[in-house]
Regions:
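Active-site acidic carboxylates
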Residues: 1-103, 107
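Alpha-helical scaffold elements lining the catalytic groove of polysaccharide deacetylases
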Residues: 108-129
């Protein structure tokens, strides 16, 4: 099955240090899965291959103001985000992992929840690339 590179994008969601790297708060909860399924290695290969084919690679981080005033309702995963001090703008933890940075063409702005589209510029990025 073929595809048109200009009509295709790979959206890399939440590949951030707070999730993906040892020593950061959320890593212990996902460490086994990341290792067992080689998530980082596979994501890098996907992004690298996409770039080689001319496909747009979009980074879609979740970030919050340092005081979490933009967090919204604090329940479920969002309560743990604040409790753990994670995904705060301007911190190393909120940054995309170094392994993917060379392949990301553009980053989504405004993601505050699980949906990559709600309140962000993702739709615009994908429609008008």
């Amino acid at each position: 099955m073929g595809f048109k590179a200009r009509e295709t994008a790979v959206v890399m969601i939440e590949f951030q240090n707070d999730f993906c790297k040892p020593g950061f708060p959320l890593y212990p909860g996902v460490e086994q899965i990341l290792k067992e399924y080689k998530v980082i290695e596979n994501a890098v290969e996907l992004a690298k291959g996409a770039k080689a084919k001319g496909v747009l690679v979009v980074g879609c981080p979740i970030t919050f103001e340092p005081d979490y005033k933009d967090l919204g309702q604090e329940f479920g995963i969002k309560a743990n985000v604040k409790k753990g001090g994670t995904f705060r703008k301007g911190t190393k933890g909120a940054e995309f992992i170094d392994e993917l940075k060379p392949y990301v063409d553009i980053y989504v702005e405004g993601k505050r929840g699980l949906d990559g589209f709600h309140g962000t510029n993702l739709d615009t990025i994908l429609r008008y690339r």
